[in-house]
Structures are given as structure tokens and as C-alpha cells.
């Protein structure tokens, strides 16, 4: 007996004597099975598509992200203010499922506060993390480096190598970044020309290194805030810092497709504002990188806010290859609201996009895309297990 809402509809006896109904039920059953099969196939395709794509942000928060690709794995870090964490993964787009370890907790009061912009590097088989820290007064920020001689940075122990003296007066220094060029190791960073009095001007400096923790040359300024888009420090709502701050910071090395042009990307204007953006310096690969005349600055930002898509302050770049080496990706920070309080990190989060190359072989960063936009994973990605 088949009932619906307590009412008898028909019985097995009726079915046996009703050929039409029997045929109808057979067709109905076939239709249901076909629908289930189609839905299963569609679900499978959807799951496959989701496995092959990702969306930004990589984390809900995490300013100043940095990553490198080494021996089949990505090593990633971002700013957490009072300690340093390191993540390892085979899938840079699936950071919540990566392995994380706290690798540094400062003990010296002189460098236990405001740990900014950590950068992970492998130099001559050893692991180094560069960062800036202070004694509680941000005016006293200096650059520090820690070292781990284990082949695996998630093992062993990071030990303090010391502060890097960027100038005899120990003027302010933040956002260190190293790169190798023609067999030489260089350090880029953001610093003050002189001790701040009334206002603050952050400039980009470069020096050649004797070893990963010591400079071999005096610092050379290669950029200072000069264009209007580099000197924004007041938010649209009127919010501002206690004094004017003109910003060039977060320098990061990259190169043209043929490696004949050295590129330094940097962040400009206040990170608390929607005007935070990315500038670009270029030099011929055969030029003297310690000669300021070797460097040319783009008169316009090369990566900036897109308010109509809810993307503000895209900057703080680093570059990583796809696992198979056929693609390059830019890792950067941005926020989904126009403004943040000075020093606030919670509204900034890490994002990843594939870059292209223009007709001259220069990187084409494109435009910062809205969050939750499905994007193809880097070529050759092995999903986290």
C-alpha cells in the first residue's frame, strides 16, 4: 500500500493489474536514477574545478607576506608583530592546511617589539630570516637577522646573528630584503636619511653585503618620496598620523624576462591609507647597482587600488615561481576597506596572482583582483595531503 499524507493512493494489487501504472513507475525510476547519475557527475566536475582553483585572500589576515620556493616546497611568513612564524606547503594557495611553526620569540628587550616584515631566505645552504624590531619605541627600529644551519628550516633552531648596522648613526631601518646579482649579495631596505624631527621620510637604500649579516659598503639611496602618489598620509575620512610620514618602503628585487633589467618594486604612501601602492625602479643588469644614477623610477604607480572592486592598498610584493617553473606569481598584501588605523594589521591580508610579461619582456602585474575570484592554481601544484 502506498500512501501520501495518510491517504491511500494505490496498492500493490492495483499495480499488478494496471500495466499503465507499472510502465509509469519504471519510467519514473529510470528518470530518478538518471538525475542522480547526472548530479553525481556534475558534483564531481565541481569538486575537480575547486581542486584546480583558489580564491584570495590566502589568510583572513597577515600583513607583509613573503615566500620562497625551495626544493619542491614553499616557505611562507608574514608579520605577526611579537614573534615569527614559518609555514611550509606544497600548495601556496591552501595555506590554512599548511604546516606552521613558531621559529622565533625574542628575549632581548632591545628587539622584542614591533617585529615587522620578516623575510625568509636560503643563502649558501643556510636559512636566514630578516626582520625589523625595536625596544618599544618605533623610532628605534633596526634590522636583524637570525640563522638556522639545518637543511630544513622547520627543524633545527634559528639563532640571532645580530643587528645589521646600516649606517654609523644607527638611523631607522626596516623592511630588509636580500638578493643575489652577478655573484654578489645585496641588501635593500627602507630607512631615514637622518633622525626624524617633526616629520618622517622613508627612503629606499641598497648596499653590497660581506656576508648575510654584515654590509660591505656604505648605504646608497636609490629612491625617496617625490611624486604626489608617494606622499599620501591622510585618509579620505581625515584620519591621519600624528605628523607627516612620506613613505618608500618594502623594496623587493625582481627582473625582466631576459634578466637584462634589474627591478626593485617598493611600496609608497601610508599603509593605513587606500593610497598605499607599488612603485618601480629599474637598472641595467650590467650597471653599477650602487650608483644612484643607474636607477630610473617609474613616474606612476605600477600596482594600485581598485575601489570599484573593493581592493585597497595593494603593495608589499614578493615573487615566487609555480612548482613546475613555467609561471611567476606575485604575493602581496591588500585590504577590502579603504582605511585602517596607523599600525593596524588586521585589515591587511595576503593575496596571490599570476603575472604576465609585456612586449618588452617586463613584468605585467595586471590589476589587483577582487577577493573570492576563482583563479587557476599555479602550474604543477601538488595539493596538501
Task: Map each language-model feature to its residues.
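Bacterial Sec-dependent N-terminal signal peptides
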Residues: 1-47
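Carbohydrate-active catalytic/glycan-binding domains of CAZyme proteins
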Residues: 38-385
Amino acid at each position: 500500500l502506498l500512501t501520501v499524507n495518510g491517504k491511500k493512493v494505490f496498492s500493490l494489487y492495483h499495480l499488478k493489474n494496471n500495466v499503465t501504472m507499472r510502465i509509469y513507475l519504471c519510467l519514473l525510476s529510470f528518470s530518478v536514477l538518471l538525475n542522480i547519475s547526472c548530479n553525481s557527475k556534475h558534483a564531481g566536475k565541481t569538486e575537480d574545478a575547486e581542486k584546480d582553483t583558489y580564491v584570495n585572500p590566502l589568510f583572513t589576515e597577515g600583513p607583509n607576506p613573503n615566500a620562497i620556493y625551495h626544493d619542491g616546497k614553499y616557505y611562507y611568513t608574514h608579520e605577526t608583530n611579537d614573534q615569527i612564524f614559518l609555514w611550509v606547503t606544497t600548495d601556496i594557495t591552501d595555506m590554512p592546511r599548511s604546516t606552521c611553526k613558531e621559529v622565533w620569540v625574542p628575549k632581548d628587550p632591545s628587539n622584542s617589539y614591533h617585529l615587522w616584515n620578516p623575510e625568509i631566505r636560503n643563502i649558501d645552504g643556510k636559512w636566514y630570516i630578516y626582520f625589523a624590531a625595536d625596544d618599544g619605541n618605533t623610532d628605534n627600529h633596526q634590522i636583524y637577522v637570525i640563522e638556522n644551519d639545518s637543511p630544513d628550516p622547520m627543524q633545527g633552531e634559528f639563532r640571532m646573528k645580530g643587528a645589521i648596522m646600516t649606517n654609523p648613526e644607527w638611523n631607522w631601518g626596516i623592511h630588509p630584503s636580500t638578493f643575489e646579482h652577478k655573484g654578489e649579495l645585496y641588501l635593500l631596505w627602507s630607512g631615514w636619511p637622518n633622525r626624524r624631527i617633526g616629520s618622517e621620510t622613508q627612503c629606499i637604500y641598497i648596499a653590497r653585503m660581506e656576508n648575510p649579516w654584515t654590509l660591505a659598503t656604505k648605504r646608497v639611496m636609490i629612491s625617496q618620496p617625490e611624486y604626489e602618489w608617494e606622499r599620501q598620509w591622510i585618509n579620505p575620512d581625515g584620519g591621519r598620523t600624528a605628523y607627516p610620514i612620506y613613505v618608500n618602503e618594502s623594496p623587493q628585487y625582481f627582473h625582466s624576462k631576459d634578466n637584462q633589467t634589474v627591478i626593485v618594486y617598493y611600496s609608497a604612501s601610508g599603509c593605513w591609507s587606500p593610497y598605499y601602492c607599488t612603485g618601480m625602479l629599474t637598472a641595467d643588469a650590467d650597471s653599477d647597482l650602487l650608483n644612484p644614477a643607474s636607477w630610473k623610477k617609474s613616474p606612476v604607480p605600477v600596482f594600485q587600488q581598485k575601489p570599484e572592486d573593493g581592493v585597497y592598498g595593494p603593495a608589499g610584493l614578493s615573487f615566487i615561481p609555480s612548482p613546475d617553473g613555467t609561471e611567476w606569481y606575485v604575493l602581496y598584501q591588500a585590504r577590502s576597506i579603504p582605511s585602517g588605523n596607523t599600525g593596524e594589521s588586521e585589515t591587511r591580508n595576503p593575496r596571490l596572482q599570476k603575472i604576465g610579461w609585456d612586449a618588452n619582456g617586463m613584468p605585467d602585474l595586471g590589476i589587483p583582483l577582487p577577493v573570492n575570484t576563482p583563479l587557476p592554481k599555479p602550474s604543477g601544484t601538488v595539493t596538501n595531503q
